[in-house]
Amino acid sequence: MPGFLIAFEGLDQSGKQTQAEALNETLTAAGRACQLLSFPDYQTAIGTEIRRALHGEREYGADVMQLLYVANRYETRKRIEGWLAEGRVILCDRYTASSIAYGEAQELDPGWLADVQRFLPAADLTILLDIPPDVAVQRKQANRDRYERDLDLLTRVRGSYQRQAADPRWLQLRGDRPKADVSADVRAAVASRLGLL
């Protein structure tokens, strides 16, 4: 059985982790081996540096921050490739499109951001859980990092995600609906596009 990589993208509080976990339960119950990932991975040295920057302990330009995010994903590249070779379904809470969305929102070239990630395994399906920026801010009032406090930035990030979602390997869903409704749409897409259910 081939492996698949499914990425969940969207603003913070859009339901990415919730939907990745729900799909993991469904696929596991159907007999598929799965692997849940979340980026950034704060358990690595690069992830620790990202956390410091997000909480204001370090100051980096937008280009350096995106390179840190990309490097954090490259830290996991060999494991991802191994899991895919084993036939696992990898479910990512954020993946390569996040760097493009947040970088483009900060006036970085999206082509450059895609190019530096070209050696990472490509997602077979990217699911955009789209919510308005004001909903994202309302859902997370406490402990927001520097990106989550900037409504204008979140609006630009959302625009980049929506442009990327024109790719046929993407599915855009409204993330402000009941969780069960979103989960049903995710399962239907995984069944029809990847034949997993």
Describe the predicted segments one by one.
Residues 1-23:
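Walker A (P-loop) phosphate-binding motif
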Residues 5-8, 89, 126:
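Hydrophobic "anchor" residues on beta-strands that sit immediately upstream
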Residues 24-26, 134-197:
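NTP-dependent small-molecule kinase module
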Residues 37, 129, 173:
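Hydrophobic residues at beta-strand termini and immediately following loops
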